[in-house]
Amino acid sequence: MGDMAKLVVELLVSDFAQSLKFYTEVLGFRQLYDRPEEAFAYLDRDGAQIMIVQHEDGDERSWIAGELVQPFGRGMNLEIEVEDVEALHASCVSYGARIFLAMEEKWYRRDALLLGVRQFIVLDPDGYLLRLSQSLGTRAVSGEPLNG
């Protein structure tokens, strides 16, 4: 079944079939296992792992700390590193997914380094923000290319 990540988010979804299709057919996740009787699936894309489960009102195992209203997942985004962000962006556009942040190149400082990414943010069917990014490498904060 492969290695399981040490941190995995479980996303409550309003339409399990639609969400499963989005994550597998549009974003390229593969299903590691499922529990059809619970409308649950454990998904993986190159080590990025998530669980999706159908939300049912009154389910005592939903672990909801407050009122659940759409869009779900407000206040956070999930960053998923991919090898070909352009192809994934094209897949999302072709599917008609809502792009929240257009494709951009962004450099983030980490101490004396800048880490570059090409990224965009898409909303899943329930409004969870997914930041899909591809590494552009590193460079010195001074702008000088790093040796190596």
Positions of PLM-derived features:
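Conserved active-site tyrosine of GNAT-family acetyltransferases
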Residues: 19, 23-24, 92, 127
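Vicinal oxygen chelate
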Residues: 1-8, 30-83, 89-123, 133-148
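Conserved beta-strand-loop-alpha-helix junction that forms the acyl-donor binding cleft
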Residues: 12-15
